[in-house]
């Protein structure tokens, strides 16, 4: 992902304030609520019967945290996202058979959650930088599909 110096600063400054457990759980939970077909990959997570059940599900929260911890690694390696996410791409492609479109959806949900959490601090330029990052991460995760 090519970010300007200002964009890198904006992304890393805001990310330093992110509670990965809270934001990760909310982002994954919202993905499962807003795009219910994504739930088929999480059938082992127990009760996904309603929005409240999903948002309160400890396995959803734990996996959301895991996802954002991986995203954090990507932020440290913006110049090598494909390398950073190669093993995860392989896992999601070959073993889990996740539709790569889901990575794009999750990235967009993450941007919405960040906007909700940070309000006025999540300015249009900050959003633009994050959109570049989540698109780059989604492309890296989809890499093994091509």
From Swiss-Prot:
InterPro entries: Globin, Globin-like_sf, Globin/Proto, Hemoglobin_b, Hemoglobin_oxygen_transport. One of its GO terms (molecular function) is haptoglobin binding. GO terms for cellular component: blood microparticle; haptoglobin-hemoglobin complex; hemoglobin complex. The modification Phosphothreonine is found at residue 12. One of its GO terms (biological process) is hydrogen peroxide catabolic process. The keyword Chaperone does not apply. The modification N6-acetyllysine is found at residues 59, 82, 144. Residues 2-146 form the Globin domain. It holds the Pfam family Globin. The modification Phosphoserine is found at residue 44. Heme b binds at residues 63, 92. Red blood cells. The modification S-nitrosocysteine is found at residue 93. The modification N-acetylvaline is found at residue 1. Keywords: Acetylation, Heme, Iron, Metal-binding, Oxygen transport, Phosphoprotein, S-nitrosylation, Transport. Coiled coil: none annotated. Heterotetramer of two alpha chains and two beta chains. Involved in oxygen transport from the lung to the various peripheral tissues. Belongs to the globin family. This is Hemoglobin subunit beta. The lineage of its organism: Eukaryota, Metazoa, Chordata, Craniata, Vertebrata.
């Amino acid at each position: 992902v090519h970010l300007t110096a200002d964009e890198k600063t904006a992304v890393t400054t805001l990310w330093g304030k992110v509670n990965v457990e809270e934001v990760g759980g909310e982002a994954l939970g919202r993905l499962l609520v807003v795009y219910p077909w994504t739930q088929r990959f999480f059938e082992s997570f127990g009760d996904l019967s309603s929005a409240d059940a999903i948002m309160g599900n400890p396995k959803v929260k734990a996996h959301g945290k895991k996802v954002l911890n991986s995203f954090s690694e990507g932020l440290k390696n913006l110049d090598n996202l494909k390398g950073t996410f190669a093993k995860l791409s392989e896992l999601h492609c070959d073993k889990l058979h996740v539709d790569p479109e889901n990575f794009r959806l999750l990235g967009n949900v993450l941007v919405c959650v960040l906007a909700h959490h940070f309000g006025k601090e999540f300015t249009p330029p900050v959003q633009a930088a994050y959109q570049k990052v989540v698109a780059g991460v989604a492309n890296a995760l989809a890499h093994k599909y091509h």
